[in-house]
Amino acid sequence: MSQFAYLLTYIGVAVFVLAALRRIVAYKKNPMHLRWELYPVAHEGGGRAAYGGGYLEELEWWNKPRETSRLRELSVMVPEMLFLKAAYENNRPLWMVSFPFHFGLYLTFGLVALLVVAAVLELAGLPADSGLLGLVIGAASILGPIAFGLALVGALGLLRRRLRDPSLRNYSAMEHYFNLALFIVTLCVAILTWATVDTNFAIARGFVAGLLTFNLKEVSSPLFLLQVVLAVVTLAYIPFTHMSHFFMKYFLYHDIRWEDKPNVNAPEINEQLGEVLGYEPTWSASHIAIPGKKSWADVATFNPAAEPEENEKTE
């Protein structure tokens, strides 16, 4: 069973990384999106972001250098990604259960990072009672149960809301319930493992050390191995579901919500526009399904006042 857990971990992490990269690459290859024209745009310079303005309000803006700030953009993105700021401001009841779930998962990733650091320090020969290693182990021992507890409370709360709130229940598929159930089971096993067999994460550190050195040593706790299997399966499963939004949110914020680069001396934008304007229209609306117009470029340049539609019915 131990060998299986090690091999499954290697495979699961590889599947997660490859599937996540595949999803990101697929997104970046999508056709150019329509601009939302939503303000404020976080990276807007000149003090305009504070009141929802934009560079288009400047006279002859196309002749002026643009002022943008990645730091201002991150100052909006980071609180949203970590603390779900928009949900807090606009849907407080949902935030009450969604925040602990997401933040608990973030802390769980932090726990894994601490376990990796601790395993490396132990492999380097530091004794467990040394200052640095002891600090890392102590931090992991505190962070672990907090992370598991927060995520479990949030997952249970989200499941309850999907079952009882009509505004969510009407739009919930079986996948949503299965995903939450998978997290609940995995987190329950993690808490049980921590409480009964691995309160200081010594077994977990040994397992991580084995992974790093390819020393697939035996693990004596079946409960810990069950925890590993559930965690790895969940990790590998995430990129194939809507839960991938946790790592796709950066792209959705940057490329969809805030992308406002003007088409001025921008050959890459011209190339993208040329591609999408060459697509064949498939809409059936009369102002789109124009006889003889074979591309979106034809539709976009068609002037119904100068070129009456041939199929237009006359009174």
Which sequence ranges carry the predicted segments?
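Membrane-interface amphipathic/juxtamembrane segments adjacent to transmembrane helices
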Residues: 24-79, 260, 264
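Generic, well-ordered alpha-helical scaffold segments in large soluble proteins
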Residues: 20-23, 27, 81, 159, ...
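Alpha-helical transmembrane segments and their immediate interhelical/interface regions
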Residues: 6-8, 22-23, 58-73, 137-164
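Long, highly hydrophobic alpha-helical transmembrane signal-anchor segments
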Residues: 1-39, 207-230
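Membrane-proximal intrinsically disordered regions of secretory-pathway and membrane-system proteins
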Residues: 4-21, 50, 55-57, 265, ...
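Long, contiguous internal "core" modules enriched in hydrophobic/ aromatic residues
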Residues: 84-226, 231-262, 269-315
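Alpha-helical structural motif
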Residues: 20, 70-74, 222, 243
